[in-house]
Structure formats: structure tokens, C-alpha cells
């Protein structure tokens, strides 16, 4: 497959996504697969909106129709549309509400201003403190000392 074909497909995909309020954040083609596989990651142009499964499904139809209607590809292909996914880092209030009970790693400064890390299950964040459950005990970390909070796997 020529570089020109890949470039034309990428441009067509980006144009189709833009027409429906999305940006393409990643575009990959796997030409060694049969049929050819095209993977496209998208995000909303409006940063306050999250990409839903319905968004991916609808955009997949539009992009598929655009490719089929063009003369760029003359072979079968699979098209996969997905989002960038969520960040591992919790920053917004809604993140802390959504992931209550999930395992997190907290980086913070102790009383001597030395960076520390601890793990536990997220309980809540208030205006004053972050609370995590560590083996049944609540650890309270002042919000002003928290450097970052990151989702982890249960094993850490």
C-alpha cells in the first residue's frame, strides 16, 4: 500500500470526523492483516464532552461510508473507532466521585516536605482532605499536600 493511499485515507477520516464534531487523535493501518485493519482514535472538539460508544458507532458508519464512496481503497477492510480513553490521573471533582472505591496511588508531601507515595482505595476528596482506605483504616491527606492521584490496578 502506497504512502499516498495511507495519507488520503487519513485525510478522509480526519475530514469526516471534523464534520461531526470530533478530532482524530491517532490513525493506524495494519496492512499485514486480512482484511486490512484501520484503527482511529477520536475525541470531541468540545473538551467538556466525553466520547461515548454511540459516538464511536455513529462515526464509524460515517467514515465507512466515506471510504466506500471514495476510490481510495479497493479491498475489504475492518474499521475500528475508539476514544483516547480516560486519563489515569484524577484531577476533577467528578473524577473523584466516579472512581470512589477504586485503587489509587497518591503522591504527596509529608510534614518535612518530602515526597511520599501511598496506595489504597479512594474514599473521597473534600475541600480539605483526600481520604483513602488502607486495609480498613482511613488515611487522611491534606489536599494542599497532594501532588497527584492516579488510578492503579488492585495489585498496585
UniProtKB/Swiss-Prot annotation:
<comment type="function">
    <text>Required for maturation of 30S ribosomal subunits.</text>
</comment>
<dbReference type="InterPro" id="IPR035956">
    <property type="entry name" value="RimP_N_sf"/>
</dbReference>
<protein>
    <recommendedName>
        <fullName>Ribosome maturation factor RimP</fullName>
    </recommendedName>
</protein>
<comment type="similarity">
    <text>Belongs to the RimP family.</text>
</comment>
<dbReference type="InterPro" id="IPR036847">
    <property type="entry name" value="RimP_C_sf"/>
</dbReference>
<dbReference type="Pfam" id="PF02576">
    <property type="entry name" value="RimP_N"/>
</dbReference>
<dbReference type="InterPro" id="IPR028989">
    <property type="entry name" value="RimP_N"/>
</dbReference>
<dbReference type="GO" id="GO:0006412">
    <property type="term" value="P:translation"/>
</dbReference>
<keyword id="KW-0690">Ribosome biogenesis</keyword>
<dbReference type="InterPro" id="IPR003728">
    <property type="entry name" value="Ribosome_maturation_RimP"/>
</dbReference>
<dbReference type="GO" id="GO:0005829">
    <property type="term" value="C:cytosol"/>
</dbReference>
<keyword id="KW-0963">Cytoplasm</keyword>
<dbReference type="GO" id="GO:0000028">
    <property type="term" value="P:ribosomal small subunit assembly"/>
</dbReference>
